[in-house]
Regions:
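Structured alpha/beta reader/binder surfaces that contact nucleic acids or chromatin modification marks
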Residues: 5-26, 30-143
Length: 143
C-alpha cells in the first residue's frame, strides 16, 4: 500500500508570500550569495546592491515609490532575502528603503557604478531552513 503524505499546501508554507509581514501585499524575494547573507545577519553589511537594469526597475517599482528608475522617498517595505534557491534555504525578512547611488567596494559594489541600493534598517524574521523562524521582537527579549 502506498503511503499518502500530508504535505503543506503551497499557501501554507513560508516559501510563499508571508502575509503576516506584508499586510496582504506581495513581497519581493531576492537571493543573495552566502558571504553577503551572513554579513547582513551579523550587522557587518547594511546594504544590498542590484544593477540598474529594466529587470530590477520593474521588480522594485512594484513595491517602492519610483518614477522611471528613480526612488521618490525613503518609505520602508519588507523584503525577503534568501541564500540560494529552493525550499529549505536560509532566509530573512528585513525592513528596507531604496536609494539609487554608488555602493561600497567592500560590500561588493564596483567603483563608479550606480546601483539600486536596498538599505537594510531592521531584520524582522530569520530562519536557517526557511521553515520556521523568530520575529525580531522575540529574539530581542531572549525568547
Amino acid at each position: 500500500m502506498v503511503e499518502k503524505h500530508n504535505y503543506p499546501k503551497k499557501s501554507e508554507n513560508l516559501w510563499t508570500v508571508n502575509l503576516e509581514f506584508t499586510g496582504g501585499n506581495g513581497m519581493l524575494v531576492l537571493p543573495i550569495k552566502k558571504k553577503w547573507f551572513y554579513m547582513i545577519l551579523t550587522g557587518e553589511k547594511r546594504e544590498e546592491y542590484r544593477d540598474v537594469k529594466p529587470y530590477y526597475t520593474t521588480r522594485l517599482n512594484k513595491i517602492f515609490n519610483m518614477v522611471d528608475d528613480i526612488p521618490l522617498d525613503y518609505a520602508e517595505t519588507q523584503v525577503r532575502f534568501t541564500n540560494g534557491y529552493g525550499y529549505k534555504v536560509p532566509a530573512f525578512i528585513a525592513d528596507c528603503h531604496l536609494e539609487k547611488r554608488t555602493g561600497r567596494k567592500e560590500w561588493g559594489a564596483e567603483p563608479d557604478t550606480e546601483y539600486y541600493v536596498l538599505v537594510i534598517e531592521k531584520i524582522r524574521w530569520k530562519s536557517m531552513d526557511n521553515l520556521g523562524g523568530y520575529l525580531a521582537a522575540q529574539t530581542e527579549r531572549g525568547v
